[in-house]
């Protein structure tokens, strides 16, 4: 039998959602069946799964240690058969529930990737390579509270993994939380801190992360309702003469991860709106302050390129010969686009 006491970071989520994360090898139907049979209890009582968890709640799971281990660490497929504790007899289900040290940097010699896959399932933790440890030194914690962390992401780092072997800011977040005592490895089974907004790999700047259910919910609400102003700085090709607010429609080609802009609405297109102010301008380059009205993938890069002012260093949407020139002459290895303010 396993007992789990809900912490402040885990409170606010539904009981069944917690169980799905805690026992990723079990189906939702199986977990609901265990709730009905009282093989899983909340505060010593039968529960339905819809209950909102609060700090101090006690969860009791009446599984054998072997069964618990199997459901927590599924190795190959899902298996909903299990051995209950001897006091309960044997059952087989049908399938179906388809702050201290916070400013301290993690010990990079011991740093590991603790995240699994992008959905939080499967995978194995692994040690970081020397190159990954060195690159992580560029990450900075800009702000911390009980529920939220704010990071500076360097250009060249993924926000989230694209494949299992990648390192990312989300991986760094988990490692940072473990190394600084914000959360333990054991607690990751019930709640995983996560970034709330993403930047393109080669864009630097501010990324928000929730380190509690409350924090993640609050950030998600602000981003969804667009109550958070997102501002960027970028250096673009050519002379931009005046401030402007531009609009259009965007489609994305998943195969080559590239967007196209349209003046009129096209099939599958999303409406986008971008505002910019000219901070400084010469005949060859302009420094712009960008405000994202909408927030679609590659919006700034694609939108500015569509009006003749691609971002410096942006090979996907800009001029390759020009970007090669500034790369070798000025050392510009990434697109000069930076998320610098969230208000």
Give the predicted meaning of each segment.
Residues 1-255, 267-270:
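RNA pseudouridine synthases
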Residues 127, 137-138, 259-266, 326-331:
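Short, P/G- and charge-enriched loop/turn segments at secondary-structure junctions
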Residues 253-254, 262, 314:
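Acidic/polar residues at beta-strand termini and the immediately following turn/coil
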Residues 276:
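Long C-terminal interaction/binding lobes of large macromolecular proteins
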Residues 273:
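Oxyanion-binding "anion nests"
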Residues 48, 260-261, 299:
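A sequence-level detector of short linear motifs
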Residues 18, 166-173, 213, 283-342:
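Pseudouridine synthase
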């Amino acid at each position: 039998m396993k007992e789990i006491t809900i912490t402040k970071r885990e409170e606010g989520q539904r009981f069944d959602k917690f169980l799905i994360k805690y026992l990723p090898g079990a189906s939702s139907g199986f977990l609901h069946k265990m709730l009905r049979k009282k093989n899983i209890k909340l505060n010593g009582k039968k529960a339905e799964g819809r209950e909102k968890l609060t700090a101090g709640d006690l969860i009791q799971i009446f599984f054998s240690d072997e069964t618990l281990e199997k459901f927590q660490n599924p190795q190959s497929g899902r298996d909903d058969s299990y051995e209950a504790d001897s006091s309960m007899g044997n059952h087989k289900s049908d399938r179906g529930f388809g702050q201290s040290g916070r400013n301290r940097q993690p010990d990079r010699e011991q740093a590991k990737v603790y995240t699994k896959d992008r959905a939080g399932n499967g995978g194995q933790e692994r040690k970081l390579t020397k190159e990954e440890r060195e690159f992580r030194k560029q990450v900075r914690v800009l702000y911390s509270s009980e529920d939220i962390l704010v990071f500076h992401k360097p250009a060249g780092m993924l926000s989230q993994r694209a494949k299992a072997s990648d390192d990312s800011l989300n991986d760094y977040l988990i490692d940072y939380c473990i190394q600084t005592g914000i959360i333990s490895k054991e607690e990751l089974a019930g709640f995983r801190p996560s970034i709330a907004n993403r930047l393109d790999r080669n864009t630097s700047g501010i990324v928000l992360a929730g380190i509690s259910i409350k924090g993640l919910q609050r950030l998600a609400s602000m981003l969804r309702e667009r109550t958070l102003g997102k501002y960027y700085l970028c250096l673009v090709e050519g002379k931009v003469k005046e401030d402007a607010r531009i609009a259009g429609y965007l489609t994305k080609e998943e195969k080559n991860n590239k967007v196209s802009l349209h003046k009129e609405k096209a099939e599958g297109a999303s409406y986008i709106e971008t505002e910019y102010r000219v901070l400084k301008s010469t005949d060859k380059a302009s420094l712009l302050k960008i405000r994202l009205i909408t927030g679609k993938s590659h919006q700034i890069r694609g939108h500015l390129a569509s009006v003749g002012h691609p971002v410096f260093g942006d090979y996907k949407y800009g001029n390759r010969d020009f970007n090669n020139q500034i790369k070798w002459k000025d050392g510009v290895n990434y697109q000069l686009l930076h998320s610098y303010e969230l208000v």
